[in-house]
Each structure stands twice: as C-alpha cells, then as structure tokens.
Curated annotation (Swiss-Prot):
This is Methionyl-tRNA formyltransferase. Its EC number is 2.1.2.9. GO terms for biological process: conversion of methionyl-tRNA to N-formyl-methionyl-tRNA. It comes from Xanthomonas campestris pv. campestris (strain ATCC 33913 / DSM 3586 / NCPPB 528 / LMG 568 / P 25). GO terms for molecular function: methionyl-tRNA formyltransferase activity. Keywords: Protein biosynthesis, Transferase.
C-alpha cells in the first residue's frame, strides 16, 4: 500500500514512524523550513528530519492549491494520504487524489475540540478525559466521519506537554490499527460525527497566556497546565512579570484584592485570585530559567514579610 504522509511538528513523528514501520511511505509532505532559534536560521520540521533519516522523499510546497502541487501528488499514485498536524489546507482535489482518500489523526474525541489546539483547550476547559480519533477527511474543518478512536483520562496535574506526548503515542497506535485493517482488506466503518457537542479549539497565541488575577484560581491553574510548555502562562507577581510553569488552585477564602501575595513558603507562593488563591510552585523571571518558589524567595530578599 502506497502511503503519502503529511505532517509537521513533533506530534506527527510517532505516526510517521508507525506508518513507515509496516507500510510503504512513498513521500512525506511537510511545511517549508522556518526561521527559528536565536540566529533565526531556517530550521526543518521534526517530520522532515525523521523522513530524511528514513530516506523518504520530502516535499515542502507553500500550498496544495496549485495545479502543479496536485500533479505532483497524483504522480506518486498514493493509495492513502495520512495527515497529522500538517498545517496546510487540503483542497477537495487533493482529498480525492488517493485511492482511499485522506485519513487524519486528531488529538480529541470529535466533535469536541475541532481545530488547531485540542490538547491545550481540553485541559484549559477542565475536561477529565480526551482521546484520539482517526478520521476520514472531508472539506470541512475536522468534520469527517470517525474510523477509529481511543479514550484516555486527563491527569489532575497533567500539563499540555505531558498530554501531548501521551496522545502522540496513542495516535500512532490508532493509525497503526487502522492501516493494519486496510492492508488486510477491511475498511474501518466510518461513523458520522454527532451534531451535538461541537466545540472549537482555537489556535494558541502568547496574548492568551497572560493571567488576570481577578479570575478564579481554578481557571488560572488549568491555564498554567494547558500552556506548559508553550506559550507558558505569565503574570505580574510582586511587581515583576514572571512565567508560571507550575501552580495549583487553593480553595481559600480571603478578603484581599486579586494579585495580593497572601503567603509564601518552600511549598509555594500563594496569590489572591477573584475566587480562591493560586499557589505558584515553579516560575521563571525574565532572562532566567525556571526555578522553584523556594529559590525565587531566596532571590527576592526585598520580600521579608513573606518569608
């Protein structure tokens, strides 16, 4: 079975490896190299690096809408195109080019959290479970019928990065199961997504990571977890902007204004919120590295009342 794989970030690498392990991946599509790092040099995507290591031809078109891009894809004579966090829109002509169409590995239990950031939005919303769907792609945004799915619980203190890694591995397994069925001549039964329960996981940006202490502590704690390791929650603490890498909500009654430092110890720095308090455990000063609350207090000798 001739497979064309399309993906870009780390999340897609496990699925590429699963596809290449037992099947013929004739080409990999990934986004063009982007400037990255302090030197802003052009950097290949994680998927490109893995494909090169496997000797798989790599294509990096700016768009798939051109006649030339479609002709190139058709010339590969794919039986199936597997798409995992690719980042480019697939027009109808591309969706129809492979014999079996295009499959997508999506990191949510569709129709909940269609869109670009399902992992982070699930944590931010306080979901207790999520999962991975293998979907037959169609023109709509993550609207296609589901072929296979797997469900997992979200840990109480699980971060976006930790859940990302678990779902990347789970997605690779679900894809492997689907490819195994197709190779055996068994096409997975496509289940249309229900009309109820549709939500959208809008793309993350740094502005969303700025915390407002007037919000409930529980919501802020979820955002700290969701936005770790990117874009990383940030807030004003004791007069300086810091990034928050670890925090928990406290069910603590108080009469203080949001943003007031309530207490501090080796266990964390407690900050008044609109409801409850947020205990900051790991944080990062501008230009520094992530440190514990205890190390932060040692560095902030100007806060004797909190020591």
């Amino acid at each position: 079975m001739r497979i064309v794989f399309a993906g870009t970030p780390d999340f897609a690498v496990a699925s590429l490896r699963a596809a290449a392990q037992r099947h013929e991946v004739v080409a990999v599509y990934t986004q063009p190299d982007r400037p990255a790092g302090r030197g802003r040099g052009l950097t290949p995507s994680p998927v490109k690096l893995d494909a090169i290591a496997r000797g798989i031809p790599v294509f990096q078109p700016q768009t798939l809408r051109s006649p030339e891009a479609l002709a190139t894809l058709r010339a590969l004579q794919p039986d199936l195109m597997v798409v995992v966090a690719y980042g480019l829109i697939l027009p109808k002509a591309v969706l129809a080019a492979p014999t079996h169409g295009c499959w997508n590995v999506h990191a949510s239990l569709l129709p909940r959290w269609r869109g670009a950031a399902p992992i982070q939005r699930a944590i931010e919303a306080g979901d207790t479970e999520t999962g991975v769907c293998l979907m037959q792609m169609e023109a709509g945004l993550d609207t296609g019928p589901v072929l296979l799915s797997q469900r997992v619980e979200i840990g109480e203190q699980e971060t976006g990065g930790q859940l990302h890694d678990r779902l990347a591995a789970l997605g690779a397994q679900v894809l492997s199961d689907g490819l195994g069925l197709l190779r055996a001549g068994i096409r997975p039964v496509a289940q249309p997504q229900p009309a109820e329960g549709v939500t959208y996981a809008h793309k993350l940006d740094k502005a969303q990571a700025r915390l407002d202490w007037a919000q409930p502590a529980e919501e802020l704690a979820r955002r700290v977890r969701a936005f770790n390791p990117w874009p990383v929650a940030e807030a004003i603490l004791a007069g300086e902007r810091v990034r928050l890498h670890g925090a928990v909500a406290l069910d603590l009654a108080h009469q203080q204004a949001p943003g007031t430092l309530l207490a501090a110890s080796k266990q964390g720095i407690d900050i008044a919120c609109g409801q409850g308090a947020l205990r900051v455990r790991v944080l990062q000063r501008e230009g520094g590295k992530a440190i514990t609350a205890a190390d932060y207090l040692n560095a902030r000798r100007d806060l004797p009342a909190l020591r």
